[in-house]
Amino acid sequence: MKLTCVLIIAVLFLTACQLATAKTYSTGRQKHRALRSTDKNIKLSRRCNDPGGSCTRHYHCCQLYCNKQESVCLENEPAF
């Protein structure tokens, strides 16, 4: 009986901690940096090329402008 009560209290405590962390995460304030390590991994895997770098698609370039004929990232939107 005592073990059951301890387990129930532990589960309730862990649930409350998760809800508090989720609320903090959703408002933009962050108390626990390790919880957002997945965001950091996503940003590191999505690198872009500076103007003059090579590209095959617009999202390869930081400015989102790719001259596909020359396969070069542009600094500004191309003039048509």
Curated annotation (Swiss-Prot):
It comes from the Eukaryota. InterPro entries: Conotoxin (IPR004214). Residues 23-45 form a propeptide. GO terms for molecular function: ion channel inhibitor activity; toxin activity. Residues 1-22 form the signal peptide. Belongs to the conotoxin O1 superfamily. This is Conotoxin Bt6.5.
